[in-house]
């Protein structure tokens, strides 16, 4: 039996459901999710392997008009995948009309000369007539290889989309071991899980200004727990106060919720310590961006 493999990028505007789709395919949380725009900041691989195929999905930051050096990094990181993949999934939401952001992405996709599958997500939110209208609108903009409507949240048609990708794979190598599900180290996943809880629990002004750095991560032989020390970075003193909360209540809640997810991922008991530090305007300083894991070598 021949083995097939390939790389697939997931592109689209912020908040269209790219990470939800990837997590559903993988059957576990690989990419963090929230209703805040620009939740995903780095390219994240989800490695889907069966006995006959390996599909390496690359979840990308939502493409937007950048206003900071961090925004520039995120957009370039997303577009750089067009040089690396065999197929692109261009994801759009069924419940929003095509906009300038979609048109900007379509122009880049046309220039890339890579097969593109249009994935219309969130079909659970619209009437079938609206869905058909949305599909027709996008079909007139570009010659898509396939158009697949799905609900990543409910799982509708997701397996069909994976089957379509599989059918179009070329014979190839197994690039990663069968038990490897992502390219990122555990430290990265831990930092993302802490950041996810900050996004869920804090006000609108906070999310874009937060980075999380895992300072240390090691097993304590006496307690048989993984001890993790993580620092939450913000840009202003007022943001630090919000994250700490009255009497430290918010920081404690962030840590408690993150610890549960980290324990599920690691399969170990975890002791998580968190601090909050202010690093003014870090999103516009390349050295700070590199220190916090946003490296230009990603693209």
UniProtKB/Swiss-Prot annotation:
Q: Where is this region: G3?
A: 59-62
- Annotated region G4: the residues are 121-124
- Molecular function terms, GO-annotated: GTP binding; GTPase activity; ribosomal small subunit binding; rRNA binding; small ribosomal subunit rRNA binding
Domain named Era-type G: residues:
4-171
Which compartments does it reside in?
Cytoplasm; Cell membrane
Region entry G2, spans: 38-42
This molecule's function is given as: An essential GTPase that binds both GDP and GTP, with rapid nucleotide exchange. Plays a role in 16S rRNA processing and 30S ribosomal subunit biogenesis and possibly also in cell cycle regulation and energy metabolism. Complements an E.coli era disruption mutant. Binds 16S rRNA as well as poly(U) RNA, binding to the latter is inhibited by liposomes.
| Miscellaneous comment text of the record | It is estimated there is 0.63 ng Era per ug total cell protein in this strain.
Q: What is this protein called?
A: GTPase Era
Its taxonomic placement starts with: Bacteria, Bacillati, Bacillota, Bacilli, Lactobacillales
**UniProt gene name:** era
């Amino acid at each position: 039996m021949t083995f097939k493999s390939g790389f697939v990028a997931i592109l689209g505007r912020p908040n269209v459901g790219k990470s939800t789709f990837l997590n559903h395919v993988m059957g576990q949380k690989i990419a963090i999710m929230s209703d805040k725009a620009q939740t995903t900041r780095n390219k994240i691989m989800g490695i889907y392997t069966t006995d006959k195929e390996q599909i390496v999905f690359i979840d990308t930051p939502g493409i937007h008009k950048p206003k900071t050096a961090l925004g520039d990094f995120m957009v370039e990181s997303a577009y750089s995948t067009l040089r690396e993949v065999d197929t692109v999934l261009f994801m759009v939401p069924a419940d929003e009309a095509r906009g300038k952001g979609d048109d900007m992405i379509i122009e880049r996709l046309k220039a890339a000369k890579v097969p593109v599958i249009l994935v219309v997500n969130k079909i659970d939110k619209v009437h079938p007539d609206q869905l058909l209208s949305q599909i027709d609108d996008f079909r007139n903009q570009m010659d898509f290889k396939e158009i697949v409507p799905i609900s990543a949240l409910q799982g509708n048609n997701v397996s069909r989309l994976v089957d379509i990708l599989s059918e179009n794979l070329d014979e190839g190598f197994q690039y990663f071991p069968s038990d490897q599900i992502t390219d990122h180290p555990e430290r990265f996943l831990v930092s993302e899980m802490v950041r996810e809880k900050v996004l869920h629990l804090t006000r609108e002004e906070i999310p874009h200004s937060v980075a999380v750095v895992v300072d240390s991560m090691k097993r304590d032989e006496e307690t048989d727990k993984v001890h993790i020390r993580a620092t939450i970075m913000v840009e202003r003193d007022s943001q630090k106060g919000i994250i700490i909360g009255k009497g430290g209540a918010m920081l404690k809640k962030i840590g408690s919720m993150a610890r549960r997810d980290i324990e599920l991922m690691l399969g170990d008991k975890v002791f998580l310590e968190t601090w909050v530090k202010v690093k003014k305007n870090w999103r516009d300083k390349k050295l700070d961006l590199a220190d916090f894991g946003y490296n230009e070598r990603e693209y």
